[in-house]
Each structure stands twice: as structure tokens, then as C-alpha cells.
Amino acid sequence: MKITRQKHAKKHLGFFRNNFGVREPYQILLDGTFCQAALRGRIQLREQLPRYLMAETQLCTTRCVLKELETLGKDLYGAKLIAQKCQVRNCPHFKNAVSGSECLLSMVEDGNPHHYFLATQDQNLSMKVKKKPGIPLMFIIQNTIVLDKPSPKTIAFVKAVESGQLVSVHEKQSIRQLKEEQGLVKDPEQRRRKKRKKVSGPNPLSCLKKKKKTQDTNSSASEKKRKRKRIRNRSTSKVLSEKQNAEG
């Protein structure tokens, strides 16, 4: 029975590795329901998960899951202790915590780029996860850890990729990486720097204004010179007329 379980797990892992780029160490996101089931079944997750998956694993959770377990009180105190020993992954709900199921679902959005496994006993969450391709799902049944087979949505997605109708998530990531290496995709940080440089640069309009100012000063200076000449002309003519009158 144990050998059959491991054979199935190996087959499913191969499927996710080849089609979605899942790799070791396998990152397994746990919710409160899975931790509670492990506690009741006396399952040592740190020992049994690597043995079952025949690979190195990382047990992970989120702040929202820990907050939810803390809120639920004494009944789930043991589950909370198990979750607290897991690595805490950053979720987008740092300020306002959401339910554990909502949080874990958000962690596998956009094609599950971090290749998380999702471990839960929540049927509602499991159904939502199965509607998204490429997410390995785990649960506990009869005190035994099980890696679920790929969902129909996942299989349909892989078939569509194979027939050329879609590009796989793994290929999308590879294409983006190649574009970044070739400099075809600009890093957002570089864009911000360029924008900042443009703002801090000299404004050509301000240069034009300065030129206009110098022209104005030149014209005003020439007007002053002209005025001075006129004044000098008047004074000499006056002197000449007075001289002529005196002689006459």
C-alpha cells in the first residue's frame, strides 16, 4: 500500500515538474485545517512529508493563517503550534489580515510563480484550487498524507499547451528571462531612474527665457544711450544759439 502511494506521488510529481517547472525543495503551504488533521493523526510532518515525496521539502504558511488560528482560540492551539514552526511567507495582506483560505488562494494566483504545493482539508478551498492549473494539492485521509492527482483543469491546460494553443507558465517565465538578458524588457527600477533624470535635467524653455531677458537688457541699454545723445545735442545747440546772440 505504501509503495503504491509513493508510486502515485512520484508520477504526479513528474507531471508537475515537466509541465510547470516545480522543483526541489518543494514549498508546501499549510493551512490550519491541515495542521489540525496532522495533530489528530499524530503525523510528524517534518519527517513524513520528505519521505513521502522522496525529496527535500519546506513547510510554509502565512501571517493570515497564524492570525486565524490565534483568533479561533484554545480548540486549535495545537494546530497553531505546528503552524508557528513553519516558515512564514509574505502575503499581500500585511495591514489587513484575511481568512486563511483567501490568503492561500492569493498566494497561488497568476500561474503559481513560486511553485507552491497547497495542503488543506478545506473542501471549498480545494475546489477553488482545482479550477486553477498547475497547483499541486495535498490532504490527509485516514491519517495518511496524499498528493492529489492533477485536476481536469490542469490536464486540459497541458493538452492545450501541447497542441500549440497556449504557452506554458514555465515557457512564459523563460521567455521573459531571455528578454531581460537581451535588454528587451526594461527593469521597472531603471525606468524610475530614467524618469528621475529627465525631471532633474535642464529645461530648454528656461534657457529661451534667459535669452529673451538679455535681449531686453540690450535694447534698454541702447535706448538709454540714445536718450543721452539727444540730451547732449540739445545742450550744444543751446550753447551755439546763446553764442550767436552774444556776438550779434
From Swiss-Prot:
Localization annotation: Nucleus, Nucleolus
GO MF entries: small ribosomal subunit rRNA binding
CC per GO annotation: nucleolus; small-subunit processome
Domain of life: Eukaryota
Segments for region (Disordered): 177-248
Record flagged with keyword Ubl conjugation: yes
Cross-link (Glycyl lysine isopeptide (Lys-Gly) (interchain with G-Cter in SUMO2)): K179
Family: Belongs to the UTP23/FCF1 family. UTP23 subfamily.
Function: Involved in rRNA-processing and ribosome biogenesis.
UniProt protein name: rRNA-processing protein UTP23 homolog
